[in-house]
Amino acid sequence: MAIWRGSEPLILASQSRVRQLLLANAGLPFETMPAAIDERAVQRSSGLTTAGEIAVRLACEKAREVSSRSPGRYVIGADQTLECDGRLLNKPAGRADAGAHLRALSGRTHALHAGVAVVRDGRLMFENVSVARMTMRELSEDTIESYLDAAGDAASASVGAYQLEGLGIHLFSRIEGDHFTILGLPLLPLLAYLRSQWLLSL
């Protein structure tokens, strides 16, 4: 039985395979349409400084950009930022940068801020930011190099140089927070919003 009551599928303004998998596993029909925005430019021009504010602003801007090309559709935007000791880390540019990220996070607790937004016809309908706290174990240089060898290009594909759903799980001693937040899409508040709009039958 289909649980979606909308007349058309959702649009996910992201190419993230993990976010796509989360929506698909939740039984939500959707199409993907990547947002054409310069994330660094949005971050610089927004004047925002906290990781949570930046995550939700980027989520909103992604959804707005795609909404401008998708009249009448519910568009989901999502973004994730990482903060460690007051410093924001961006997605690593390559292996050397990923190694630097891991050295900075080694033995410390960092926060992942996941923002999600829903926009329809250019109007912000819903936004949420959730936080998870991640404690990385002390990593030796050998461990970092072994991880980078094993992870390959995946080490540069996310802001923390790890994917918790993959080899990244080996790097942590403690995790506090919602699983979906860690994966970059606060699914529970998103589903609650869709339910409040009578778009879900469950």
From Swiss-Prot:
Cofactor or coenzyme needed: a divalent metal cation
Active site feature: D79
Entry keyword rRNA processing: no
Record EC number: 3.6.1.9
Gene3D superfamilies associated with the record: 3.90.950.10
Reaction(s) this enzyme catalyzes, per UniProt: a ribonucleoside 5'-triphosphate + H2O = a ribonucleoside 5'-phosphate + diphosphate + H(+); a 2'-deoxyribonucleoside 5'-triphosphate + H2O = a 2'-deoxyribonucleoside 5'-phosphate + diphosphate + H(+)
UniProt keyword list: Cytoplasm, Hydrolase, Nucleotide metabolism
A GO biological-process term: nucleotide metabolic process
CDD domains hit by this protein: Maf (cd00555)
InterPro entries linked to this entry: ITPase-like_fam (IPR029001), Maf-like (IPR003697)
Subcellular localization, as worded in the UniProt entry: Cytoplasm
Recorded family membership: Belongs to the Maf family.
Name under which the protein is recorded: Nucleoside triphosphate pyrophosphatase
Species for this entry: Nitrobacter winogradskyi (strain ATCC 25391 / DSM 10237 / CIP 104748 / NCIMB 11846 / Nb-255)
